[in-house]
Amino acid sequence: MPGYSALEKQHLIALGTTIRQVREALGWSQEQLAERVELHRTYIGGVERGERNLCLLNILAIAEAMGISPGKLIDRAFPTRAADIPDPPGATAGDGGPANR
């Protein structure tokens, strides 16, 4: 993956691995996921191997197709990151802020 730092590569691999785990839990092939999100199977394979940098719209489409919220998908890929995000100023319990995802 030319141009990516070691940390960026780790992030791509973590998200790709999570997408693969969810896809496999659903019993879907890469081809089936690709058809549902109107992307090519080789793109999905590259994502799952951490070789492709997904744009936000593709993350949204993949998450929706798999029946998982984009936030939950990211939280599964980076479980310690969610706890590191401070609540926005004025956020209270139950308002849908990061602490309530």
Regions found by a protein language model. Give the residues of each.
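Short, charged recognition helix plus adjacent turn
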Residues: 2, 64, 74-101
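A short, Lys/Arg-rich alpha-helix, primarily the initiator
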Residues: 2-25
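Short basic helix-loop element that most often maps to the first helix and adjoining turn
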Residues: 17-36, 61
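Conserved hydrophobic/aromatic packing and binding residues within compact polymer-binding modules
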Residues: 19, 33-34, 44-47, 73
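Core residues of bacterial helix-turn-helix
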Residues: 26, 37, 47-48, 66, ...
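Recognition helix of helix-turn-helix/homeodomain-like DNA-binding domains
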Residues: 38-54
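DNA major-groove recognition helix of helix-turn-helix/homeodomain DNA-binding modules
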Residues: 57-72
